[in-house]
Structures are given as C-alpha cells and as structure tokens.
A protein has these predicted regions:
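Conserved ABC transporter NBD signature motif
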Residues: 61-73
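Catalytic Walker B motif of ABC-type/P-loop ATPase nucleotide-binding domains
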Residues: 166-169
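H-loop/switch region of ABC-family ATPase nucleotide-binding domains
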Residues: 202-203
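Conserved ABC ATPase "signature" region
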Residues: 119-137
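Conserved catalytic motifs of ABC-family nucleotide-binding domains
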Residues: 162
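Conserved ABC ATPase signature
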Residues: 141-145, 149
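Single conserved hydrophobic/aromatic residue that forms the stacking wall/gate
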Residues: 216-224
Length: 224
C-alpha cells in the first residue's frame, strides 16, 4: 500500500472576515500518484493548493480548524520555506511568481536562497531548463519568452529544487490546446522518470485523462 504524502483532515478555512472557502475537507494524496482536482470556479481549488504547501493559513492568515499533514508532519509551526524545499508550487497567476530578469536567474533564484554552491546551481539550472524543453535559454530575458514558455520556466525553477511533490494550479492557462497537451505529457514524463508526486488543479480534465491515477471533483463551491 502506498504511503500518504499529503493528508487533510476535517479542514476548514476562511480568509479574514470572509465566508468559508474550504469546508470539512478530508483528502489523502498517495506517494508517487498523479492526482487531479477538478471543480467549478469558486470551489476553493487555489486555496486548497496553498493549504497543501503551508501558505494557507500560516503565511496569508485567516481562520481555520482541522489539520494538514505534509510528508508525515503537520504544517502547524513549520516554515513555508522549509516545506517549499520538498513541495513545489505553481499557481495559475504564474507571473506573480516570476522574480528575475533572465531565465537562468529565475531558475537559480531559489537554489541560491537555499545555499547551494554556484557550480551545483549552474548544473541544476541547465538540467531543469533542458527537462522542460528550454535548453540553452539561460540568458534569455523573460520578455523574450511567450506565456507558455514562462509557465515552463516556472516549472523548471520548481524542478531544480528536486521536490518530492509538485502542486500545480491550472498550469496551462496561458497555452493553446497543443501547448497544454505538450506540458502535461512533459509532467507525466517527469512523474514517471523521477517518481515525483504530481497534484494538478485543472477544469479541463480531458487534457489529463491519459495520465491521472486519482481524480477528485467538487460539485459546488466549498463542497470539496
């Protein structure tokens, strides 16, 4: 039996002075699975992604009850930066996560912040860009890349840290159907090659049917 890497138990969450965004969530993600979470707009899927990485509630604030466990430990009292070394996150608003001028600097940013040696940073950056189909783009300015390429760049920055889990919130929102299929083929190849646990929030489930192990759907907002 596969072990759990993420578990939400009786989890409720509301942003400050707002109604409940997540209500009575019980969810278990197995190690090495490729899991899809689907549901309508307003169902709390983005907030769920943030809860899986400790951003909600411990970075953004809000009211909550219940528990979230990541890799066998509760997120309570853990630093978001420590969780980020093991759980990568790509949000739908990917532009807000891009912080550098060039593709190489973007991939290297979190590695340098975590104290990796320059030689290892350079090698991980090269390999991550190659893995996402952007080989040799280290010196490219971000404004030279298309929206889809910038989403691939953010995936490269996530992969470079070698996370055990990757959580992706609508990662193909800036892509045409061909680009979306290509990115999900890439994600599945990474999942197969490295055994990475993949969790994708996506309203177009048809993109993912060839790859998914587990599918969770939400019929109405906040009823996850």
């Amino acid at each position: 039996m596969m072990e759990s890497v993420i578990r939400l138990e009786n989890f409720y969450f509301a942003y400050n002075k707002s109604e409940l965004v997540l209500q009575d969530i019980d969810l278990e993600i197995k190690k090495g699975s490729f899991t899809v979470v689907a549901g309508p707009s307003g169902a709390g899927k983005t907030t769920l992604c943030k809860a899986m990485t400790g951003i909600v509630p411990f970075y953004m604030g809000g009211r909550y009850s219940g528990d979230v466990q990541v890799l066998g430990e509760s997120t309570k009292g853990r630093r978001v930066s420590d969780i980020a070394m093991r759980v990568g996150l790509m949000l739908e608003d990917y532009e807000s996560q891009l912080v550098s001028l060039t593709a190489g600097e973007e991939v290297a940013f979190s590695l340098l912040n975590h104290g990796f040696a320059p030689e290892e940073v350079a090698e991980r950056t090269r390999k991550a860009l190659e893995d996402v189909g952007l080989p040799g783009r280290e010196s490219y300015q971000l404004d030279e890349l298309s929206g889809g390429q910038r989403q691939r760049l953010l995936l490269a920055a996530t992969l470079a840290v070698h996370p055990e889990i990757i959580v992706l919130d609508e990662p193909v929102s800036a892509m045409d159907p061909d680009g979306a299929h290509s990115l999900y083929e890439l994600l599945y190849a990474i999942h197969q090659r490295y055994g990475t646990t993949i969790i994708v929030v996506e309203h177009r489930v048809d993109y993912l049917l060839p790859y998914v192990c587990l599918l969770y759907t939400s019929p109405s907002p906040r009823d996850m």
